[in-house]
Amino acid sequence: MRVALCALPDVREATRMCLSTLPRPAAPPPPEVIRAPIWTTWARYKQNVDQEKTLTFAREILRHALPASVMEIDDKWQAGYGELDFDLTKFPDPKGMVDELHALGFAVTLWVMPFVEEDTEAFREGSELGYFVTSKRRTGNLKPGFFKWWNAPPVVALDVTNPEAVDWFVTRLKRLQTRYGIDGFKFDAGEPCFLPRMFETREALGHPSEYTRYWVERVASRFALAEVRTGHGTTGVGVLTR
């Protein structure tokens, strides 16, 4: 083990010295995610979110003379985890909603994660193409390859070491942007602790945390307005880490 000892005048100088050894992004995250609050539906409604509540939330923000910055539509906007399209029962006119939020001055982002539940078209398509992390061992009483993530149904994980799988996922996100005018995404999860026991990826990982690095570098970095909650060796990626 190598141990480096530093002697500097104060904590600020020590921090600056340490930061100087890390990669820096070519550009910072967009100003709108730093200078003003990110208004997330999760803080107000948790999973009980829909189109009318989202618009009501935005109008209340403006009525209280607070800044219109980023409106982040969080968990349960999809019909199923990983579908990457709106639940039309809860959001009957997604394009109209996004247009109205834009007119009010908000940028609009959506919550996404690299996990897909079984009872979805995304799972059927991705499974046929071999786009998910696999496992020959069960996690508890779940099917091989499946695991529990928070309070979601059992899910599988996108294989971020597989370039075709990454392109498939990113293409579906960009389709959302084109169809509805979405400005960016909140990229949740990405930690290897959620993955199934004895998991296998197309490209072998040097250590499990490389899954996190690939999630940020290969997916989140493809979008100008991106927020992540985790990172590993990704200080050079110009995304907001919350």
Question: Model-found features: residue ranges?
Answer:
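Aromatic- and carboxylate-enriched substrate-binding clefts and catalytic-loop regions
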Residues: 67-242
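Carbohydrate-recognition beta-sandwich/jelly-roll modules
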Residues: 1-69, 95-100, 104-108
